Amino acid sequence: MFVDVGLLHSGANESHYAGEHAHGGADQLSRGPLLSGMFGTFPVAQTFHDAVGAAHAQQMRNLHAHRQALITVGEKARHAATGFTDMDDGNAAELKAVVCSCAT
């Protein structure tokens, strides 16, 4: 079986980058104030303001959840790459030991 650990590391880096991009989006979104009365002072405007506020809060929660998921995927890819490298190194050492003991 061939595993491209470089590609796993590259994917991990991209996943972390995407996670930080989601975090940056959440930060930018949190800076946008939803001022009372920004849509008017009549009752329907307040109802709309409340709906926009709820959607705003949900979007920020979604972005934070996406960030965490992407970072977790990146960490798992790095862990897998390390595991494959360690296993390959261990197997190579065992094979070398067998070859050397057979040669003597």
UniProtKB/Swiss-Prot annotation:
Pfam families tied to this protein: DUF2563
Database matches in InterPro entries: DUF2563
Family: To M.tuberculosis Rv2078.
Protein name: Uncharacterized protein Mb2104
Source taxonomy: Bacteria, Bacillati, Actinomycetota, Actinomycetes, Mycobacteriales
